[in-house]
Structures are given as structure tokens and as C-alpha cells.
Regions:
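DUTPase catalytic domain/fold
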Residues: 1-176
């Protein structure tokens, strides 16, 4: 059986960023907590169209058929009604080496409002080179304004046993 997988702490995260092993753009050291990195909500979203017919869940499902892409300028917001979901994306572009994976976690201050930042896709594969799409759902009781540039979630980094690189269709995603 292999060794353990360790969560990277602040000092280790900063060391690896300074060495160029992990890249986050844009980046400021104030984003790094004891064992996570704050990521910010970008300006681009996908909102779901009001559709009355069922949509087939398949490997090649085309979100363009049921969503529309919108851009929210800085200083503006997207209102997310209770029970509704949208796709957002991080401001930060993240590049991980083949021996580091990650996890996205919502922030507790927003969870208390009923805001879910990722529906089920919180795992970030080693070797990714992209911005992270967020499956954002308002499970609360009141409409919530999604404001670009807010520190919306945290990235937790973990060292992998061995090396691997994700090469799937979302490896270099730039839009939700």
C-alpha cells in the first residue's frame, strides 16, 4: 500500500508557488489561509433557460441547448433565486503539477445563506491548467446576488501518491 496524501499548509503552498510548481493567476499572498487558497467569482456565468421538456443526461450533453452565457460587469450582480442553479467560474487560472490535486470548498459565511458553490464536482485533477467552473445553487430562502470578484470558495491542495495528469475535455476550460 502507498503512502499518505497530505494537505498542503500555507508555508508549503507559498513555497511551491514561489518555486513555480503551482501557478495561480492573478495571485496575492493574502488569499492563502492556514491550509487553503481563497478563489474569487469571475464575471462570466451560464444561466439555465426556462425549458419545459426533459434534457437527456449523457456523456455528450450540450449545455448550450439549455443555458445561455452572460457576462456581469464589475459593480453589477446576478440575482440567484431560491432553488435556482447557475454556473460561474473563478477569476483565478490554476495550474497544478502532476503530483498535486485539489478540492473546492464553499465558504461557511455563504453556506449559512444556503449557497452551495459546487454541486458534486469539487475534485480538481492533478495537472489541470484552467479556471474552475462552479456549480452554484441557492438552497436558501431569499434571493442572493452573485457579485463578481467576491472570494467565493477555497481551494485545498493535496499531494498525490505518484503522478498523473488530467487530459479530459475540461483541462483548459476558460468559460463556464
Amino acid at each position: 500500500m502507498g503512502g499518505s496524501m497530505s494537505i498542503l499548509t500555507r508555508d508549503e503552498i507559498l513555497k511551491r508557488i514561489r518555486a513555480g510548481q503551482i501557478r495561480i493567476e492573478p495571485f496575492s499572498e493574502v488569499q492563502v489561509g492556514p491550509a487553503s487558497i481563497d478563489l474569487h467569482l469571475g464575471n462570466d456565468f451560464r444561466v439555465f433557460k426556462e425549458i419545459r421538456h426533459p434534457f437527456d443526461v449523457t456523456e455528450h450533453a450540450d449545455l448550450d441547448k439549455i443555458t445561455e452565457q452572460i457576462h456581469i460587469p464589475d459593480g453589477d450582480s446576478l440575482m440567484l433565486m431560491p432553488g435556482k442553479t447557475c454556473l460561474g467560474i473563478t477569476v483565478e487560472h490554476i495550474k497544478l503539477p502532476p503530483n498535486v490535486c485539489g478540492w473546492l470548498q464553499g465558504r461557511s459565511r455563504f453556506a449559512r445563506l444556503g449557497l452551495v458553490i459546487h454541486a458534486t464536482a469539487s475534485f480538481i485533477q492533478p495537472g489541470i491548467d484552467n479556471r474552475q467552473v462552479l456549480e452554484i445553487t441557492n438552497n436558501g430562502q431569499v434571493p442572493l446576488n452573485m457579485i463578481p470578484k467576491v472570494a467565493i470558495c477555497q481551494l485545498i491542495l493535496q499531494e498525490c501518491v505518484g503522478q498523473a495528469t488530467y487530459s479530459g475535455r475540461f483541462r483548459t476550460q476558460a468559460f463556464p
